[in-house]
Structures are given as structure tokens and as C-alpha cells.
């Protein structure tokens, strides 16, 4: 039995639980901007990635474009089952995906032997999702902004996917809290493996906010 994780940059991952292939928060091609517009913050991928083949599940933590990226989701077959937060479910529904399970924090569903429990994630502004994933091949927790659900009990896990740095704006504070959450995750889950997410990959940002984004810490310091 094997549990494998392949990083796709930003928040994207391909998780493999034996032969079950789960794509998480993919950003594979095109630019990235938020509802305020690209003048404020725009991300560009210098190199596009093809969509991985033979997928069994699409798992989305948030409905924002850096998690539910419409141009990337458009690459995927519409009969691919989707599990996501309420806001993510609205995005994939608008794109014509056929089988969508919307989860609120605390709710659980099962897909081909994988138990998916939604946990309370980042308030952006509505509370989005992290996930506790349990399969015979292994157990994994992921949340892309460093917000740990206080209701999750202590339990040993095989892997944790989390940011390892803090990202924020002056006067507003951190909206990604990797430095502070990593020690809590280690204490609560005693993971065999910690995998750094969110701030990695080959991404170029522009716009008014790009020059004042603050990053504190590093993978080496936090790990």
C-alpha cells in the first residue's frame, strides 16, 4: 500500500492512495487574479502544465481563484467527481461538472475507499475547508492557509500538507500562517512527513499588492 504526493506549485497537488488519484486545487495554465481585478494582484505561470491523466477525484479547499482556477478546471472532464467547499462547489457547477459534493466543516463523505472529512479552514471571508483524508494506504491532513481546526483531535498521521511561511500585508496581518501553525501540526498529528505548500512553484506576481506582500520565515526555518 502506497501514499504518494506530487506538488504542482501554489496550492496544487496530486495525491495517490494506492491507485486512487486525487487532484487538489490545481492551477495548471493561464493567469490568476481575484474579484478586485488584475490591477491589484495578478499571478502568471511561466510554464503551463498538462492536466494529469486518469483522475478519480477533484478536491477543492476554497472557491477563490488560486484554489478553484476556472481556466485550469476547464481542462478536466466534466464527469470527474468533485468534493469541495460550498464556494468551490458553485465554481465547478458553473463550469458544468456533473457530480459535486459540497462539504461544510465537520461533514464527511466517502469516495472509493477514501474518507474525506472537511475541517474548518481559512476565513476568506467565509470559513473555507481543510481536509482530513483517511484511506487504507495512509492518512493525510491538508489546509492551505495555516488555519488549524481546534475541533480536530490529536491522532498520528502519515503526512501533513501545510504552508511553512507566513504571507501577509502591512496593517492587515498574515492571511497565510505557516510559521505559527507548523509546530501545532507536529504536536497534534506527529506526522511522518511534512510537505510545504502554498508559497512554492514558479509563479510571477504583478499589481499594486505585489510589492508590499510580506513573507516571513522559510521552509528551512519552520521545518
Annotated model-derived regions:
Residues 1-44, 191, 209, 217:
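Zn-dependent metallo-beta-lactamase
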Residues 24-25, 55-68, 83-86, 141-146, ...:
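Active-site neighborhood of phospho(di)ester-bond hydrolases with catalytic His/Asp-centered motifs
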Amino acid at each position: 500500500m502506497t501514499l504518494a504526493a506530487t506538488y504542482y506549485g501554489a496550492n496544487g497537488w496530486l495525491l495517490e492512495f494506492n491507485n486512487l488519484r486525487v487532484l487538489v486545487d490545481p492551477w495548471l495554465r493561464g493567469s490568476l487574479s481575484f474579484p478586485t481585478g488584475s490591477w491589484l494582484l495578478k499571478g502568471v505561470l511561466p510554464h503551463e502544465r498538462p492536466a494529469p491523466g486518469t483522475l478519480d477525484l477533484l478536491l477543492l479547499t476554497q472557491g477563490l481563484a488560486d484554489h478553484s482556477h476556472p481556466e485550469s478546471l476547464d481542462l478536466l472532464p466534466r464527469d470527474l467527481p468533485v468534493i469541495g467547499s460550498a464556494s468551490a462547489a458553485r465554481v465547478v457547477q458553473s463550469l458544468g461538472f456533473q457530480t459535486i459534493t459540497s462539504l461544510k466543516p465537520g461533514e464527511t463523505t466517502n469516495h472509493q475507499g477514501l474518507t474525506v472529512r472537511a475541517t474548518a479552514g481559512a476565513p476568506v471571508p467565509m470559513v473555507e475547508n481543510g481536509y482530513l483524508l483517511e484511506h487504507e494506504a495512509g492518512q493525510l491532513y491538508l489546509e492551505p492557509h495555516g488555519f488549524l481546526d481546534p475541533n480536530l483531535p490529536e491522532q498520528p498521521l502519515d503526512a501533513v500538507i501545510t504552508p511553512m511561511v507566513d504571507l501577509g500585508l502591512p496593517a492587515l496581518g498574515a492571511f497565510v500562517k505557516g510559521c505559527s501553525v507548523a509546530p501545532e501540526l507536529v504536536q497534534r498529528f506527529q506526522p511522518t512527513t511534512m510537505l510545504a505548500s502554498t508559497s512554492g512553484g514558479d509563479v510571477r506576481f504583478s499589481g499594486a499588492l505585489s510589492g508590499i506582500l510580506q513573507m516571513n520565515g522559510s521552509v528551512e526555518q519552520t521545518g
